[in-house]
């Protein structure tokens, strides 16, 4: 029996030690894989950059090393990585052109507009771009029209149908569960709360939504018209008369594409452009490959920091939720990062790239203050992405200079408060009973199993009004306007970048490149390089984060599966924990572009 126990014990110890050894070798292999990915890539002569655009487009690239190893990944692309790849390809003499292949790309119109402008700029080098897809979404077709030639599969389609917004209202749904939202707001156009209190859009919200989606569509049509030599009237006619169900041959007849080909035939087309024989291989470079290609002429003396801030503005990250890993602007984290940049003597100016519809009014004010401190030490320039509205505009308004794309959604200067009331759910649906013991009249303020009384509503209305007045004053000070001037364009009113320029909410139209150039000019430096912040998480940081956050894989899958319903569902999930006072655009802004 002793020998048996000894043998079992020895076997267990042996298995344990073997597991440790395998684990060590596994980690060493992973480190080697990560390190090898950073090696400089040599570009072969006569190469082509392949831009495969499919998935969710984020502002900043983040390699999901663990997801790649486990197979639990969902497609996510970084605007910064794509832009860098295009610039490097333009400058590299061995790269002859770009092959653009699109699928389903989750991107806002401003992001597409910025990428399109970069493709147009790429062609100034004399190099070619060809685009191909089995099925173009409307946004991807808009992007593809920057190419010299646009091709489609014979049975492919282009979803060219115009832009629509479909608000979602959850008042009746919540009522079925015994939940009622108590809402207080300031601003005629502050429509974010309508989803809780109304069954349809208010007249003011319908008017402003119609105005800005029309502006987005007009911008898209104008650019496509110029590239394809099709009048905007004709483009609207095609959208109204079902071109989105046409096949390749019909699209060719309408001059929306230059050719109809299968995927294998496109290889022959690219070989022809590269002047290769039929049996020669195409030297291809991906976006990931370009990250390791040395950029030409980047040995500047001074650093211009580009700080990426995108997602909901929150006081602290939401953990332990299916939605916990959605990217967010965490107020405290941003303040710490900006303080470090302020104290870094190597950094001569800071560009803050913002893509946010807002969120916590408290966090927005803290970031406004930190930008104010940063501005006293070095120039601060804002580059707006698809949205820099409400809280996103709050943190923007104090910069030295503000850039927006024509199709950026901005403004929305207003504040509201939402407190859910679960008393009907608890008492009538679940049979729960509550009693009260308190030291003071308002000791139960904020508890969600009761309605606020009139006095509490008055208190909260006062706090929200003060917050609105502070927001309005911040804009007036930052934009050198009077409070009355700000009030005329506030009240929660949403504007496109094009309109925002006319009313002085922004200084100039343009993308991130223009913002960087302006920051360098304000810092009085001609020899500079850019550095992105916050630094992407390395392998070990991702490993630690994965052990504490449970939602990354499921959140990615939810985002892919829910599509346009993802943001409203995330809001319902987070409503009980978010800050009571919010400066944000509507959660339900579903734009079919």
Language-model-derived ranges and their functions:
Residues 521-524, 529-534, 591:
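C-terminal recognition in membrane/secretory proteostasis and scaffolding
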Residues 40, 49-167, 297-425:
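Cleft-lining beta-strand/loop regions that shape enzyme active-site pockets
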Residues 361-366, 499-502, 542-547:
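Short glycine/threonine-rich loop-to-helix capping motif typified by GTGT followed
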Residues 170-186, 275-298, 416, 420, ...:
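Surface-exposed, non-catalytic interaction/assembly patches
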Residues 266-309, 315-320, 367, 526, ...:
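Extracytoplasmic and endomembrane cell-envelope/extracellular-matrix remodeling and assembly machinery
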Residues 3-38, 46:
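Hydrophobic alpha-helical transmembrane signal-anchor segments
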Residues 299-304, 308-344, 463, 534-593:
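Intrinsic disorder and flexible/low-complexity segments
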Residues 167, 171-271, 423-503, 507-509, ...:
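Charged, glycine-interspersed solvent-exposed loop segments at helix/strand-loop junctions
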